[in-house]
Amino acid sequence: MSSSKETKAPPTRTSEDWAMLPWRKLERHVYRLQKRIYRASERGNVQAVHRLQQLLMRSRAAQLLAVRRVTQDNRGKKTAGIDGVKSLAPPARLALVDALHPTHVKRSKARPVRRVWIPKPGKPEKRPLGIPVLRDRAHQALVKQAVEPEWEARFERHSYGFRPGRGCHDAIEAIFGVIKQKPKYVLDADIAQCFDHISHHALLNKLATYPALRQTIRAWLKAGVMDAGVFTPIEEGTPQGGVISPLLANIALHGMEAAIRDAYTVREGKPTLIRYADDFVILHPTHAGIEKAKEAIEPWLQTIGLELKPSKTRIAHTLYPLQGETGFDFLGMTIRQYPVGRTHSGRDTYGRLLGFKTLIKPSEDAIKRHVRAVGQVVRKHQTAPQAALIEHLNPVIRGWAAYYRTVVAKDSYARCDDWLYSKLRYWARRRHRNKSLRWVSRKYWAFDEGAGWLFRASDGSVLTKQTKH
């Protein structure tokens, strides 16, 4: 009697396999490794940093989280690279995790990014994005988990853009802390096409990582761009759209703060540089001090292939007008000080009157962009039911109002509400051209004793008012 061994088919991966993974446990495991990398970097133990980074990237937990980041969590997860893949079903996500195993990664080659042009808010020109293929995005997310903690231990105090636990409001708060007791001169600067012109050589030298990782990052930088089917090689820059691009830009710009401060003597007074990605301001008590900052920053930027954008670089003062303007705009805020009498004046740490007050408000450009965005939603839903219009307007209004909730925005909110009311009244009247304004108002608005007139649909949905925030 002959016996034969049964050949078992490999288990079929299902959506449940992905959903049932212990995500909290995986996150804790990766976080512990990242904390060890951070501490080793703080100690300056380069060998330990590189060893732990390799350990993290071999970790199945880190590989799973990297794939989840680019297929499930990330806002750009539905944007395809040149592979045309926009999304993956859970079983395919597990296959992508397998592709991040070191043996597979070594054999893979970085593929060109797909050029996508998106409009700049409030401007006619467009901004280029470079979208990597999904496999490269997942690999970049894995590498970012390993490299970011090393640099978080090293990044300068006043770098706020694209960093965990930091954001726009922290940068604004830092500026307020510098100027609240004493007015300052300001170099309000912008780097020309920062992401497109960073020197690869300077970036890789600053990165100073181990050879295999250096080669991986170099391959992404040199992968090239496919724009409408035409391939273009890349010799500089890190395309916006890659998972790791903001981190690489921050690494390239690291050292700017120290370079500026080192140019000053103690007697001159050290300036303060506050940076959010490629936007930054430098503050100093004297005009000569700001001129010196501009002279110091330009050659430093040249060492990494960058330069200031003249049309967006100016010297301002927070209290007094310079060239007809007082204060400056930063991250959608207007930051300015106003001379006031003793009743409204702030006080210094000793209780003495300052003679001015500092106000931070939404900038005029930010208000115009918001009004334009809201207007586009209304126009797009001219024939839609009221409830559908409310559903699409509310996230735009809430997001904008939430961003400015910590600054002096009451008047700006009221202006936007008034403008939106007139827009909605026109929207409603054109749907019922033969009806009176009173009839239209009763159909689309309802009066609430606490909130006043509300744009309310028959299903009970209500348009959010910005003045409520």
Show where each model-derived region lies.
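Non-catalytic terminal/accessory segments
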Residues: M1-H469
